[in-house]
Amino acid sequence: MATTLNPSEISELIKTRIEQVKLSAESRNEGTVTSVSDGIVRIFGLADAMQGEMIELPNKTYALALNLERDSVGAVVLGDYEHLREGDVAKTTGRILEVPVGKSLLGRVVNALGEPIDGKGTLGPTQTAPVERVAPGVIWRKSVDQPVQTGYKSVDAMIPIGRGQRELIIGDRQTGKTAMAIDTVISQKHTGIKCVYVAIGQKSSTIANIVRKLEENDALDHTIVVAATASESAALQYISAYAGCTMGEYFMDRGEDALIIYDDLSKQAVAYRQISLLLKRPPGREAYPGDVFYLHSRLLERAARVSEEYVEKFTQGEVKGKTGSLTALPIIETQAGDVSAFVPTNVISITDGQIFLETDLFNAGIRPAVNAGISVSRVGGSAQTKIIKKLSGGIRISLAQYRELAAFAQFASDLDETTRKQLERGQRVTELMKQKQYTSMSVANQALSIYAVSEGYLDDIPVHKVLTFEEGLHAHFSNTQGALIDKINNSGDWDNNIEAAFKQHIEEFKTTGSW
């Protein structure tokens, strides 16, 4: 017997089904790839694309929109582009490039997109943040008044660096720029400063050596290594610095201190020049595009010391009464010591000072090869440890006078007593400023060495024995005055009691003759 359906039941059933249907409309702008070459794709039809927007291409490949023209968009592919073809569909995403940030990145080696490349598995819990961000405004900034100890006597005494400062390390190839940066990272082991090391356009073997050295010195646990090797595309080398900065800002925004090293921005500028020329942008001086200054200024301005109010506002009241900082140490490689080239002068004008490393000093065995005459720190003086600031005042003058007199003494046959003493003091100061790699020195030991040379205790020590004397002096104080050394390292203060103790025990050590 056939069942008959009641018309009212049919209408009720249709009504129920209609109510259950979920319609979602997603508006996405689509275009067509018209050409692919050298990592650059030209796309016709993406009328609503935004500057810096992520463009989705086939096989989960993404490109970054950089040129917005009347009928087409020029985008740079992030990753491999061999599989892309003319006629492929390209879609806008409405998002700008983001990278993972968070504490789970510490101790890891990642690429420019934040993907781990160290073979240690996936990252732990992370958030994401855009690679491009507006730097903190004037109102949210605080003055730099806390030091970043590099562990180098010559830097901490003459060219001090403060938390939130931008200090350029500049010099020819093979003058110890990377060595100085890595030693600074190693020196932060017990300071609580988180470090980000961005390797731009370097050999994979060099980066592997750096990671190994950080591991050997127990410094990888507080460091994120962002690697954009020489074999990677210009786009990833260009992006890597901004990605590393975003990872460092995560700590600054939450009331912590971070240090970022860009090694080096010369190669980033070359990568950006390559992208710009391929995008047919008009070249300027040295074939760089017109906005190469903005390339570095918008990156380095993100390094800052931010106020308690900024941190409290960013964390929505979770963190109160703490300031955050991001200290930047950009590295620039010069050609034959020419600091007046385009990119070096740009970065010198953006930063708060520069440490100039000289080939002649390096070859003469004076390492770190810091040229005290043209190296300067514009804001670090106010952040210098009290004891180092008090004792190191005469060091820079002694060195400058020594260099001047040494040049003059080559032409003079006989020298008066004062000049001869200045030359001998200068020789000992120069010798004392030498320091081997991976031998970070504490504040107390730096103060001890500077006090000894400033007060003339090394004047009767042969120049070739100065470093041996220094080593013995540090060991003597460590064995007999451990409490005093700890006190200086913890407080950084200077008073008459410390001076009396220094004087007494240096004289005592000299009488032993055990160096």
Swiss-Prot record:
It is found in: Cell inner membrane. ATP binds at G171, D172, R173, Q174, T175, G176, K177, T178. HAMAP family: ATP_synth_alpha_bact. The keyword Nucleotide-binding applies. GO terms for molecular function: ADP binding; ATP binding; proton-transporting ATP synthase activity, rotational mechanism. Its main location: membrane. It comes from Xylella fastidiosa (strain Temecula1 / ATCC 700964). Keywords: ATP synthesis, ATP-binding, Cell inner membrane, Cell membrane, CF(1), Hydrogen ion transport, Ion transport, Membrane, Nucleotide-binding, Translocase, Transport. It catalyses: ATP + H2O + 4 H(+)(in) = ADP + phosphate + 5 H(+)(out). Produces ATP from ADP in the presence of a proton gradient across the membrane. The alpha chain is a regulatory subunit. Belongs to the ATPase alpha/beta chains family. CDD domains: ATP-synt_F1_alpha_C, ATP-synt_F1_alpha_N, F1-ATPase_alpha_CD. GO terms for cellular component: plasma membrane; proton-transporting ATP synthase complex. The record marks S375 as: Required for activity. Its EC number is 7.1.2.2. This is ATP synthase subunit alpha. The keyword GTP-binding does not apply. Coiled coil: none annotated. InterPro entries: ATP_synth_asu-like_sf, ATP_synth_asu_C, ATP_synth_asu_C_sf, ATP_synth_F1_a_nt-bd_dom, ATP_synth_F1_asu, ATPase_a/bsu_AS, ATPase_F1/V1/A1_a/bsu_N, ATPase_F1/V1/A1_a/bsu_N_sf.
